[in-house]
Amino acid sequence: MAKTHEIKVERRADEGKGASRRLRHAGVIPAIVYGGELEPVSIQLNHEQIWLAQQNEWFYSSILDLNLNGDVQQVLLRDMQRHPFKQLIMHIDFQRVSANEKLSASVPLHFINEAISPAGKSSEVVVTHELNEVQVVCLPKDLPEFIEIDLSTLEVGAVIHLSEITLPAGVEIPELKLGKEHDVAVVIAKHGQVEADDVADEAAEGDAK
């Protein structure tokens, strides 16, 4: 069961650039909820509440319960506009989700036990995480807050591909249906000397030009 987080919102009466500017001056974020069979609804949120929430990973990858005076709608964050240099959120888009319809979402990858793996124990090995998140398709109830990748058995020279990730029940990676060339590397454990040699070769090629 996907974990949800509740966020209290209010309906927004005034719209337009002037109204949005006044809301921001008052510490309120203009936002919109769309999708499903319902009409889009303009809402507003407390900036301080959202500023704290957006510092957490779950804000971007979990089902959110928008509570409008007791009317709760389940949504996903789809877009968040930030001020270019101020600590200010300008606008947020939320998309409604239906319990019976699959959704597409980006889910963070959490890598565990790297330090105790054969590759992690070697001072001569460089372990790189090529991806930090993955796009998945699933029903809302199956959406994971994150996907854990156990690296405890990672060997020197090993490569973990997208197809090797253990997924929770009901979760799919649509990228894998597009062909073998989309089965990209997620983790690479490369011997440090190999990397140093590659750098040296590139430098030599540059000098020769």
UniProtKB/Swiss-Prot annotation:
A single MF term (Gene Ontology): 5S rRNA binding
Keywords: Ribonucleoprotein, Ribosomal protein, RNA-binding, rRNA-binding
GO cellular component: cytosolic large ribosomal subunit
Keyword Amino-acid biosynthesis: no
Keyword Ribonucleoprotein recorded: yes
InterPro entries assigned: Rbsml_bL25/Gln-tRNA_synth_N, Ribosomal_bL25/Gln-tRNA_synth, Ribosomal_bL25_b-dom, Ribosomal_bL25_C, Ribosomal_bL25_long, Ribosomal_bL25_short, Ribosomal_L25_dom, Ribosomal_uL5_bac-type
Transmembrane stretches, start-end: none
Task of the protein: This is one of the proteins that binds to the 5S RNA in the ribosome where it forms part of the central protuberance.
HAMAP family in UniProt: Ribosomal_bL25, Ribosomal_bL25_CTC
Record's protein name: Large ribosomal subunit protein bL25
Name of the encoding gene: rplY
